Amino acid sequence: MDRPYDETVDIPDSEDIATPRLQQSLAENLDKLRDSYGDNSKLLTKTNSELANRSIKTASKSVIRMDSSSEKLCDRGSSDDDDDDDNDDDEDEDDDDDDENANIHDATEGVYNPADYEHLTVSSEIKEIFEYIQRYTPQTIELETKLKPFIPDYIPAVGDIDAFLKVPRPDGKPDYLGLLVLDEPCANQSDPTVLDLQLRALSKQTTTKQVTVKSLENAEHQTKAIENWIKSIADLYRTKPPPTVHYTKNMPEISQLMSEWPKSFEESISNMQLSLSQLDCSLKDYVDIICALLDIPVYNNRIHSLHLLFSLYLEFKNSQHFRQNESVIT
C-alpha cells in the first residue's frame, strides 16, 4: 500500500544543512517510470500527477518543519543572549558593590583625609611632616599562637563501697586491717597536766576546777621526769600573758610615774634623810605615805593603788637603763 511518508530532518544548533532539492528527485522518478512502462502515456501522466502532488506535499511539510526549527534556533539564540546580558548585569552590580564598599571603607570615621587640612596656613616643615602620614604603610605582623597546657583541677572520684571481702590469714587469726583504730605514741608526748594548765591560761578561766596532779613513784630514780616538769612549768609562766586589771578609778600611766622628779624635790628629800623603815605607823598609813611620794592616788579601796605600785616596781626592775646603772655602781 502506498502511504505518504513525511521526511523529517533534525537540525542541530551548530550545523547548517541545506534544504533538500525537490526537482532533482522528481526528474529521477520520471526517468525510472519511462524506462519501466515504455509508451503508455496515460499511465505516465497519471503517475506524473501523483508524483507531483506527493512531491508538493512533501516539500510543503519539509518547509514547515524548517520554519519551526529556525524559530526554535532563533528562540534559543535569543535566550542565550539574554543569559549573557544577565551575567553582564550581575558582574556590573558586583563591581558597583565593591566600589561602594571601598567608598564606605575610605569614609571610615577618624581616617586621615588631607583635603580637610589644605586650608590651613602652616609652614612647609609642618606640611612635610603631614606627608609622612600618607607615606606610611602598616606592616602585617602575624602573631604566634602559643599553646598553653590546660591542667584541670583534681576532682577525687568516689570509689566503690568496701564489701569487707578480705582474704583470711593463713594462720586463722582475725585480721583487723582497716577496722582497728591504733593510738600510736609520738616521740615527745605532752603532759596532760601541763596541757590543762596551758589551756586554762589561754582561756582565762576564773572558776576553779579539780585538777589531777601527777605523782611519781620512786621519784629519786626519775630525775629526768622531774626536770622536764620544772622546765614545762617555767615555760608556761614565761609565755603566760600578764593579767589585766580594770581600774574602777582613774589611775595614771606607768610611763608617767617613771618620769624624772624635779631637781628641787630630789634635793629636799636628800637633805631630809628620810628613813621610811623607822616610821612608827600602821600598814594603811605606810601605804598611803609611799603612794603619796610616788604620785599614786589612793581611794577607799587600796588594792588598785597597791597593784599600780607593784607594777611600777616591776617596770623599774626590768628596765635596762636601771640595770646598766646598777652594774656601773657595783
From Swiss-Prot:
Localization annotation: Cytoplasm, Cytoskeleton, Cilium basal body; Cell projection, Cilium
**Keywords in alphabetical order:** Cell projection, Cilium, Cytoplasm, Cytoskeleton
Would the keyword Ribonucleoprotein be found if you checked this record's keyword annotation?
no
As recorded in UniProt, coiled-coil segments are none
Q: A GO term (biological process) for this protein?
A: intraciliary transport
Q: Which domain of life is it from?
A: Eukaryota
Q: Does the keyword Cytoplasm apply?
A: yes
Question: Chief subcellular site?
Answer: cytoplasm
Instruction: From the record, give the cysteines joined by S-S bonds.
Output: none
Q: Where is the composition biased (Basic and acidic residues)?
A: 68-79
Q: Name one Pfam family in it.
A: IFT46_B_C
Q: Identify the GO cellular component terms for this protein.
A: cytoplasm; intraciliary transport particle B; microtubule organizing center; motile cilium
Q: Where is this region: Disordered?
A: 1-21, 55-112
Q: Where is the composition biased (Acidic residues)?
A: 7-16, 80-101
Record PANTHER family: INTRAFLAGELLAR TRANSPORT PROTEIN 46 HOMOLOG
Tell me, in a sentence or two, what this protein's role is: Forms part of a complex involved in intraflagellar transport (IFT), the bi-directional movement of particles required for the assembly, maintenance and functioning of primary cilia.
What family is reported?
Answer: Belongs to the IFT46 family.
The protein in question is named Intraflagellar transport protein 46 homolog
The organism encoding this protein is: Schistosoma japonicum
